[in-house]
Amino acid sequence: MHRIIIPTTLLSLTLLSPQISSAQDFTVVKQNPITSVKDQNESGTCWDYATLGFVESEILRTTGKTYDLCEMFVVNKDYMDCAIHHVRMHGFSQIAEGGSADDVFEVIKKYGICPEEAMPAPGSLVGDSLANFNEFRKVLKPAVQYFGTGTNHTYPADALGVSSKNFKTIPGWQDSVQTIIDRYVGKCPEKFVYEGKTYTPKTFAESLGIDWNNYISLTSFTHHPFYEDFVIEAMHKWRLRPSFNLPIDRLMSILDNAINAGYCVAWGGDVSGNFWANGEAYLPNSKLPVTQEIRQQQWDDWTFTYDHVMLIYGIAKKANGKKYYMVKNSWGTQYGHKGIWYMSEDFIKLNTTYLFLCKDAVKKKMLKP
């Protein structure tokens, strides 16, 4: 989830890349409108930037209007929700920067959203020009644990052999944690003016013309039955929102159909390997097809994990005829092809944790055996 962590690995992999491709090496087959590439900088908020980019592309698709929505509004609300959940679970849940596409939609449905200009610019409150959580990440979790449980234990009390009944939450702890979050990412506005009109975050979300309940998360694993919902067992899925389980070939068909029908898709998956800084992701020297069994094996042995979220917005082909997907990242324009990656079909097939997209992009028959 961290740009600061993943690119460190990514940059070392760059030296191992067999060849450097340029954008001219790819022929666009289908390309859907997106907004500009953003930079999450030193913050573990890929899930936020990618999903708001997805929302912006949905607004473009449905209204033709361009918006720059505020990532730090979502961070503020989501981190507070996460802190409350962490305390209610007596520490037996994550409190970290990572998240998923579900989080963004849950925040918007509950609290609304605002444009970028309605809050302090990312990083400005800590003397940076972009989001910088280097200090924030060191402060937030200990603060939640101290104010929420009255202890500075870094692990759940019961895990230390001490009953959580020995600890009590400190009265007003939520206000204390909220003050810290506001200090680092900015306080969310109650009202703001946008293009001459006054909005609350809720009325602004309503004005965007999006049905926030008309979206679905799809996945593909064999440790749960196909054609049923289940919660993906990943640490950043703390809201426990379900995904609908499908065979991988069916999932790939849905992705293709959606892109070709003019929809963008939020993608959650693994970029810890074979994801080159020059803007290409593929499985080198891969002669065997990616199967459902290989995916499951790599998920089970932790070769394949959930560590990044991006936006798929198009399909392209390389000169050798190999199929790629066009992907908008959130690491600024200094990486990839000015912030765009080309991910091969087999890479996507192996490394996809979930797809998040509009229900209208999915034919109902595709969700049935």
Where are these regions (language model features)?
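Bacterial Sec-dependent N-terminal signal peptides
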Residues: 1-24
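N-terminal regions that are enriched for targeting/export leaders
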Residues: 24-32
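Cross-family signature of deubiquitinases and ubiquitin-like deconjugating cysteine proteases
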Residues: 33-58, 62, 77
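Active-site signature of cysteine proteases
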Residues: 35, 162-171, 175-369
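Active-site nucleophilic cysteine motif
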Residues: 41-55, 95-102, 173, 308
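Structural recognition of the beta-strand scaffold that forms the well-ordered cores
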Residues: 45-48, 72-76, 104-107, 115-118, ...
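Sec-exported extracytoplasmic/periplasmic mature domains
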Residues: 51-60, 109-113, 260, 317
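Papain-like cysteine protease catalytic cores
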Residues: 71-195
